[in-house]
């Protein structure tokens, strides 16, 4: 500190001397050189990180330098910076290039910055001189020219650390000052080093303290976690102990109940023995009747006893006889239903029958029905493998409790019956290994040897029973001694029971292990079966493909009725095998756990045995259907339910061959005499709000037709009776090559049937969506055909009102057919009914003031636009009201790529004013035909259907089974009263 004070005093003295000699060079202050890192030293621009005081000084100097860029003073500081154009960018570049950052340290006396070391400062000075030499051409020469001082001062610039420090006006600065500066800088560097070292030590100490704190916190957290884990373990142990205690209490309660039961049985049997021994006759020791009766007495069953005794006493009935009779009736009905179900499933889907368990449930119902009938008849029941023994069964017949009064009579028939009791009890125990308590309850008059005999097998029971007979044939006096022995042996019986329970538990564990092994074996077998079945399934597919190819090659003019159905049934049953085996492999665990005793020993799939059976059973219903056709709504049962789309399609070749077969198409059919039973239903072609369309075949001629099936209840609920009647009326009147033909109509209790022409090419809508749009040529041909169809209808005073791509079908030749005449109507003047599709409806229909034939020409313009563009012009993602608003405005925007002639026709058809719309003018329909859009059209060739614009795509049809008895039918019927429903049916649908 003393040295620092001395240095400060020396510096102050030097400053005072310098101020006296050269007051104009106040910027070149030795004190400021040591105090600030950001100041300019002797014209150099070396900058370092400084404190707030040094930064303020550097800013002042920097501002003064900016203000004095153009002054020609004697000051060397300004001359150095004014030799070049010193703009802000050069400064920033220079500062960033020269800056030398060092770690911060504490200030010494608030004046000396600790960032400037001797070596570092020299590096900065060298950089500054180099940069000054590069940027300023020969700075030293300029300094010498501008100053009036000695040349020795310039030489000091190259040797001194401070650079051009002697460029000022004073001549009193010598080499001693430079040495003093070096000494002061060396002292400063020492202090900087010591301060930095102290700071580093302080930082290290702080880091160590923080690490220690973190370690302590981690240790505390670990200890808390360990304590929490220990508490949780203790809680778990307590819960386990509580559970064990509860189990022990339950076991004790069960043992007490068993002991109470044994005591009651012993008391009852003791009373019986006393009463029997008083009136004992040794003539009835080995009679089977008495043995059977004593079994019934000992077990609480009174089968084949005196009816007077049962009638006089009102015994507590376990199950009432009325309930039993009602259950019997229900089981008999259910068993019949299950029998029908099993027979049908055997013929149609045998694998579903095998895996569903329906057959097993049928057997269970039969067992239940037999038990109920036997209990009602009062017959004794024999235990079966699926039933527990009698001592645990709750008897279903009228039973009475055992009291002493029940045995006051029939004394002569109850003498020494212990032998028969032992025989029957041993047999019952062999039937069910889980129930061994009955052995001890019935051995009351036996010795200790007889108690041990109950634990043996059935082979030892006969020998033990013979010994019992010999003991019982001695005299009546031995009975009293045997009774006393029974009391002493009761504790032994309890011990034996406990041992037996332990043995039972061990046996159960062994059984479970065996069952698990069986499950694993079954899984392995099932995987093998599934692999075999996949191979067989592929073979069947190959065979079916070969069969279809052979059929297509060798097929003559006639097609058999059953070939397609047989192929489909074979594929269908194979597909059932494949899918169901996969389901079994995925669900083995659940099925095996639920069906341990009944289903473990059964194999789920035997392809070699059942392969030909399910094929024949699937074909059989089709032959039966052909010989004796079912009601029309039940014909869906003859078509197997399909799961795979690829394997359940009616081939396109079958459709094409049927259509092109001249013999089939040329056969005469009297449609007036046809019935519903003459037609066989196939695939679902389409569906609507209250109608479904299915492919059908006329059985005698094998010709394909289209059957439109309409639900009467839905029609009435939607109030479409008039439209349905109009559709029939219009179709019966029309006969045009561009309109679908209606051959006949049928009716039953629920449905209306329209027999129509089958159009195999599909809808025009599918072609537009598949290609995006249609070409100009195709659009011209189809628009011309539609014009001819509408011309025919308008000449018949019929308006169509539902022109859209969905109602335009493509026949096998590639021409248009109009279908779905639900909104068609025969009119003589304008009508005001509101109907149509929102995107195609005319504005005059929306107004409700009346519309006529011109509404169809509006729809024609919309249709031509959609065929060329791909979408209708008036479309909105919102509600229908938005579409209606666009239609009323009729601001149609045709894309520029559309042909100009087509654009002109669309703009003339889509006009809100009916009087200005093309087709409604004086020329009528001729104005449309004469439009340049149809300039290249030969209307006679179009009428004769000579040229088709495209080839139709006849695709295979998927099987979609229609359930005629659907829920919507019942829901629609609930909205209408039955009387009103029948009255409206008779009013509108009587002519069908």
UniProtKB/Swiss-Prot annotation:
UniProt record, GO biological process: signal transduction
Reactions accelerated catalytically: L-seryl-[protein] + ATP = O-phospho-L-seryl-[protein] + ADP + H(+); L-threonyl-[protein] + ATP = O-phospho-L-threonyl-[protein] + ADP + H(+)
Limits of the AGC-kinase C-terminal domain: 935-992
UniProt key word ATP-binding: yes
Compositional bias segments (type: Low complexity): 1-19, 31-56, 63-89, 104-114, 131-160, 405-503, 581-601
Domain Protein kinase: 679-934
Keywords: ATP-binding, Kinase, Nucleotide-binding, Phosphoprotein, Serine/threonine-protein kinase, Transferase
EC number: 2.7.11.1
Superkingdom of source: Eukaryota
Gene Ontology cellular component list: cAMP-dependent protein kinase complex; cytosol
InterPro entries associated with the record: AGC-kinase_C, Kinase-like_dom_sf, Prot_kinase_dom, Ser/Thr_kinase_AS
Positions bearing Phosphoserine: 833
Record: active site: 802 (proton acceptor)
GO molecular function, one term: protein serine kinase activity
Pfam families for this protein: Pkinase
Polar residues bias (residue ranges): 20-29, 383-404
Region (Disordered): 1-160, 233-296, 382-503, 520-556, 581-602
Enzyme class: transferase
Ligand binding (ATP): 685-693, 708
Family membership noted in the UniProt record: Belongs to the protein kinase superfamily. AGC Ser/Thr protein kinase family.
PANTHER family noted in UniProt: CYCLIC NUCLEOTIDE-DEPENDENT PROTEIN KINASE (PTHR24353), PROTEIN KINASE DOMAIN-CONTAINING PROTEIN (PTHR24353:SF87)
Name of the protein in question: Protein kinase 4
Organism ancestry: Eukaryota, Amoebozoa, Evosea, Eumycetozoa, Dictyostelia
